[in-house]
Amino acid sequence: MKESINILAIESSCDETSAAVVVNGREVLSNIIASQISTHEKFGGVVPEVASRKHIEVISAVVQEALDEANFTLDDIDAIGVTYGPGLVGALLVGLQYAKGLAFATGKPLIGVNHIEGHISANFIEYKDLKPPFMCLVVSGGHTFIVYMKDYGEFEVLGETRDDAAGEAFDKVARAIGLGYPGGPKIDKISKEGNEEAIKFPRANFHNDTLDFSFSGIKSAVLNYLNKKEMKGEEINKADVAASFQKSVVDVLVDNTIKACMSKKVDKIAVAGGVASNSCLRETLVRECKKKGIEVLIPPFILCTDNAAMIGSAAYFEYIKGRRTSLDINAVPNLKLGER
């Protein structure tokens, strides 16, 4: 095998169009991201059809910019990695069809990547010496998982949400208290001005050994609290609501992740996904894990949110295992972790 394997990666599962060039799964030569946040902000969330159209408008330029920044041409690329699920089907199709076209035209192998696997692999970029096994907490707008990574590309899901993802709950609560979209960063910011002990919102604790999550109850409790305040004409302290809600979500995420580590006897937790940039989650996880002798690994913000570099990293580890994807592959919006 060549000393250096160069992956051109493409990500378009939601509202970021991204392309990257990644070498050997850990070195990022370029990572171009065209965000649509300003486009969707006025709608209070991502509009799937609008997202697809925006991907179509920019994908060619984004891929070319990624190649140019890396000082590469397609001749220098060994394989093309692309997200094929989970995500918004229309958005996924834009990146997938573009990648399939490149693979067909150049004869380069295509590697379909699970978006969640990409988030986990972002840690290999930031932590060059990181190797499995380790635990990973994946928290984003659409996904919440506790994953035991046994080996490269081999996962065991120990816990997942039974309803709303953590990031989805953040967005809905932010909208309810008038903070707008995207909710996660705005709740994180205003929470710094609030008292996290001001309101006791419930935590979902299941009565068996499951490590699953449920955030719909917390979200509903916040909405009920707001409705009662409005009906009584009482003032609502947005900062206190945000801080108390955030703490209730973070406490459950941290507790279950530490339990998972103890059950598998691992001493490393990697964090992935957009909600991993939340300051309360970072601080609480580091503080509580220190008490248990568990190391916490958290990538920088740009690698927590959707990006193609993480897809390139995951694609590399698939490539060296000899896995290739047929050009007949289709988008799978509800793709499960570990499915191929």
From Swiss-Prot:
GO molecular function annotation: iron ion binding; N(6)-L-threonylcarbamoyladenine synthase activity
Protein family according to the UniProt entry: Belongs to the KAE1 / TsaD family.
Main location group: cytoplasm
Keyword Secreted: no
Cofactor note: Binds 1 Fe(2+) ion per subunit.
Residues that coordinate or bind substrate: V138, V139, S140, G141, G142, D171, G184, D188, N278
UniProt xrefs under NCBIfam families: gcp_kae1, T6A_TsaD_YgjD
GO biological process terms held by the UniProt record: tRNA threonylcarbamoyladenosine modification
Name of the molecule in the record: tRNA N6-adenosine threonylcarbamoyltransferase
Tagged with keyword NADP: no
Location relative to the cell: Cytoplasm
Catalytic activity, EC: 2.3.1.234
Protein residues bound to Fe cation: H115, H119, D306
PANTHER family linked to this entry: TRNA N6-ADENOSINE THREONYLCARBAMOYLTRANSFERASE (PTHR11735), TRNA N6-ADENOSINE THREONYLCARBAMOYLTRANSFERASE, MITOCHONDRIAL (PTHR11735:SF6)
Species of origin: Clostridium botulinum (strain Hall / ATCC 3502 / NCTC 13319 / Type A)
Catalytic reactions on record: L-threonylcarbamoyladenylate + adenosine(37) in tRNA = N(6)-L-threonylcarbamoyladenosine(37) in tRNA + AMP + H(+)
Key words of the record: Acyltransferase, Cytoplasm, Iron, Metal-binding, Transferase, tRNA processing
Known cofactor(s): Fe(2+)
Function: Required for the formation of a threonylcarbamoyl group on adenosine at position 37 (t(6)A37) in tRNAs that read codons beginning with adenine. Is involved in the transfer of the threonylcarbamoyl moiety of threonylcarbamoyl-AMP (TC-AMP) to the N6 group of A37, together with TsaE and TsaB. TsaD likely plays a direct catalytic role in this reaction.
Gene Ontology cellular-component terms listed: cytoplasm
